[in-house]
């Protein structure tokens, strides 16, 4: 079974988790929200219910969830 099947893909829930873990939203331009913590930054497309699995995986890796 693929370990990515149960990965969160809803941008609203991803953003909520990032903010609860201390990430700071530094900008939002159009549908892309940029977050930063320490020296790491990442971009989350929002609003989007079903992010592509590759995008969700990339966000999870940058956030340290994988």
Predicted regions and their residues:
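Amphipathic alpha-helical segments
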Residues: 10-22
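C-terminal structural segments of small proteins and small subunits
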Residues: 38-66
């Amino acid at each position: 079974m693929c370990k990515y099947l149960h990965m969160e893909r809803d941008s609203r829930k991803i953003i909520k988790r990032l903010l609860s873990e201390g990430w700071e939203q530094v900008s939002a331009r159009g549908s892309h929200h940029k977050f930063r913590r320490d020296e790491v930054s990442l971009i989350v497309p929002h609003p989007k219910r079903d992010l592509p699995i590759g995008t969700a995986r990339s966000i999870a890796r940058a956030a340290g969830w994988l």
